């Protein structure tokens, strides 16, 4: 399973760990992914999405119906 948000498309980023001596080693910044169930009133069912914390706030703001319509327009099966 990919570490990618289904709503925002956010995935891992690459950066550096930097020590006090300014030595740099590669590291990955992983998105804050949560597996969440959302109740879709119009379809009378639960939808499980793997989303970031930012996407949860987006769903709270715009509504699950608008977000699902956007996902379906992109061709994702939900």
Swiss-Prot record:
GO terms for cellular component: cytosolic large ribosomal subunit. GO terms for biological process: translation. It holds the Pfam family Ribosomal_L28. InterPro entries: Ribosomal_bL28, Ribosomal_bL28/bL31-like_sf, Ribosomal_bL28_bact-type, Ribosomal_bL28_sf. Keywords: Ribonucleoprotein, Ribosomal protein. It comes from the Bacteria. GO terms for molecular function: structural constituent of ribosome. Transmembrane segments: none annotated. NCBIfam families: L28. Belongs to the bacterial ribosomal protein bL28 family. This is Large ribosomal subunit protein bL28. The lineage of its organism: Bacteria, Pseudomonadati, Pseudomonadota, Betaproteobacteria, Burkholderiales. The gene is rpmB.
């Amino acid at each position: 399973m990919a570490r990618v948000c289904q709503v925002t498309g956010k995935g891992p980023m690459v950066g550096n760990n930097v020590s006090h001596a300014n030595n740099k080693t590669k590291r990955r910044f992983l998105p804050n992914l949560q597996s969440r169930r959302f109740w879709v009133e119009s379809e009378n069912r639960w939808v499980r999405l793997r989303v970031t914390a930012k996407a949860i706030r987006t769903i709270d703001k715009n509504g699950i119906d608008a977000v699902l319509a956007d996902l379906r327009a992109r061709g994702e099966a939900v």
